């Protein structure tokens, strides 16, 4: 499972011109589900994201987590994080999970955020969306649940 995580001062997502999710201070999480992903991947990423110390403390050092600052999450599905661009110019998405598996694990990640006491807003799974954000910092991180198995 892959996530692009952006620290934001505000963000919202629109579907067909209607705002369906909006947050203030927090993290915009673009979440992609791969064919090999499982519930453990969803739980791992949700825990990791909630506990990332990417918010500034009183000395302006990145030392506070989402929970520490009372931040929110805007969770948006993003299967294109599994794009393979090695051959030709048209991306292949063969490594992305099929829609039913992707939706199930996206919803598992959503539930994992909620279980940690985080307020979560969402886009609409599978819809064409417009995501608006004010990236604070800017701070943008790429996380891949497979990385947890690689040696440091």
From Swiss-Prot:
Q: Name one GO biological process term.
A: D-amino acid catabolic process
Instruction: Name the catalysed reactions.
Output: glycyl-tRNA(Ala) + H2O = tRNA(Ala) + glycine + H(+); a D-aminoacyl-tRNA + H2O = a tRNA + a D-alpha-amino acid + H(+)
Compartment(s) of residence: Cytoplasm
Q: Name one GO cellular component term.
A: cytoplasm
**Annotated Gene Ontology MF terms?**
D-tyrosyl-tRNA(Tyr) deacylase activity; Gly-tRNA(Ala) deacylase activity; Ser(Gly)-tRNA(Ala) hydrolase activity; tRNA binding
Main location class: cytoplasm
SUPFAM superfamilies, alphabetized: DTD-like (SSF69500)
Keyword vocabulary terms for this entry:
Cytoplasm, Hydrolase, RNA-binding, tRNA-binding
Q: What is its EC number?
A: 3.1.1.96
Query: Where on this chain is Gly-cisPro motif, important for rejection of L-amino acids (motif)?
Result: 137-138
- Name the source's superkingdom: Bacteria
UniProt similarity note = Belongs to the DTD family.
Q: What does this protein do?
A: An aminoacyl-tRNA editing enzyme that deacylates mischarged D-aminoacyl-tRNAs. Also deacylates mischarged glycyl-tRNA(Ala), protecting cells against glycine mischarging by AlaRS. Acts via tRNA-based rather than protein-based catalysis; rejects L-amino acids rather than detecting D-amino acids in the active site. By recycling D-aminoacyl-tRNA to D-amino acids and free tRNA molecules, this enzyme counteracts the toxicity associated with the formation of D-aminoacyl-tRNA entities in vivo and helps enforce protein L-homochirality.
Q: Per the record, what about its domains? A: A Gly-cisPro motif from one monomer fits into the active site of the other monomer to allow specific chiral rejection of L-amino acids.
Q: How does it assemble?
A: Homodimer.
Protein name (database record)? D-aminoacyl-tRNA deacylase
Question: What organism is this sequence from?
Answer: Thermus thermophilus (strain ATCC 27634 / DSM 579 / HB8)
Q: Which gene encodes it?
A: dtd
